[in-house]
């Protein structure tokens, strides 16, 4: 309800916020606070009664204050007027609500409170990152350090940014690492340059490798060190093309040996067979190395391998080895590898069509996706169209925009992202109570706060020195080799680095204004598209102002889907199709409870990256078991090629080793169980679900409640009759 009517006095005051900001007086906020407290009463006050209280509050504020007023002074007036009206129960609840908020604000920076949550295994702490096993010592150490980092970080942030984060208006990502340390987020490691020129890790000067086995061993060491020097994911772009020269060294060595020991007409065949085995063994070692690594962050490195564009014999063999190794699985039981994320590029004229030269590898990639969910698919031409040049995402979905260096050369590898701040869009919609003018007013306020938060992120990472992370700044991971005294801004400025404005919950936003079945309503769709367009216009202006690439990022929201919804449930109560689900819908995604066809879903979602959300995005389709019908998946891939840039496959691949069931496990309150025998023991089941951009194993490493709820209600976009 909007209470700004003619019968209410108009007040022109400035409100001095706790965080030091000055904002215009807004009587709707007082009324909303009264309504929230009133909803908790067994016998609530009527709407008319609340309005009488508000009139008295406004009259008293107008009488007592002329130019500005403090927040606590407004609250005192409200409490006094409630007591004057003999609304003692409502006054008590209002005071409790305010006190509770103050208490939580102080708790957030109290290390003892957060340590207690960790020791008591509060799921919001131990399950915040589904890639971290909170039972092991090194993860516990990281979580403990993270609590200290968050506490100090909140004190370092500009007061209004910290306040907005604590209230749930925005989310300042990775507070356990930044701004306490000036770490960067995710990157595309310059493996090509590092392998060619050598590098240094610790006390070891590492020379350029002389074989593919040594090259992959070096890559695993680089990944471990880079992942320990930043907090986000790391990706290898065109790994098949990067490794091919080292595979060729193996071939030349085997060919030289063959000339001494093998008949002339068999020498090339011998060298190829030996090299093929070397390639397979090297790529298998890399897969095992990544899955057995633990970084100083207490987790397996978030790693992505991009491949598929190479055409030489060596490049093709590397592509095939990556896929065949993933199909085989890990260990004696052949479990699905969670890392590295595989990203296969499809390109017209190369592997898209049946008569293209690498079509056979596309077929292998599709087989792999039906059995292991990875690889995800990149559409070469669409990525170029959306981002200005081709590259794989950093981590799971963060895309760099096209960028040329001082020599006019297109550069992707060696670039990075400096961090993310996500805005709670559903909250803005609910605060506006269906008034679009109010929505855009609050939207502008939140975007201004997000801008300040992102600018602070940039300024903080610039305070690092090359000595803080030698692998990144001095030895080539970031594409340049700085001296110890150089400014790290050399690898960030002139839009070389990105910094991301995230968002969540377009579905919920439109639901506030148009109801939960809005997807076929053009007016509702246009409204959500306008939100992305406005965000894009803002980040372009910020980029021009500051010289760093601000981008619009479709946040993965692994735990944020839970945090924002939980906080808004406390603020607005149970709201149909919004907070009652116990999660918020990721970015621009179609409501997961509905079942459009894959083609309808992609057609619905394709506009959002195109109009601005190109700084980070991914599309998914949910399928039944596909292993007996890979052509169904190929049909979706082919349809997607000219429509979306990045597509993931979600298909049931859970396995029970007790009864040998394979398919889709049933969700339980905190995990999943075999539908055949009820087994839920992580030692004898392999449960693999799409957690966000990455896969996760929720039975072994549980996720937050909101994400579990969202996974549990996902509906297939293709049924048996569609296959």
Where are these regions (language model features)?
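Short, hydrophobic beta-strand segments
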Residues: 13, 57-63, 303-304, 508-510, ...
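Short, mixed-charge aromatic SLiMs
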Residues: 56-62, 82, 527-541, 710-722
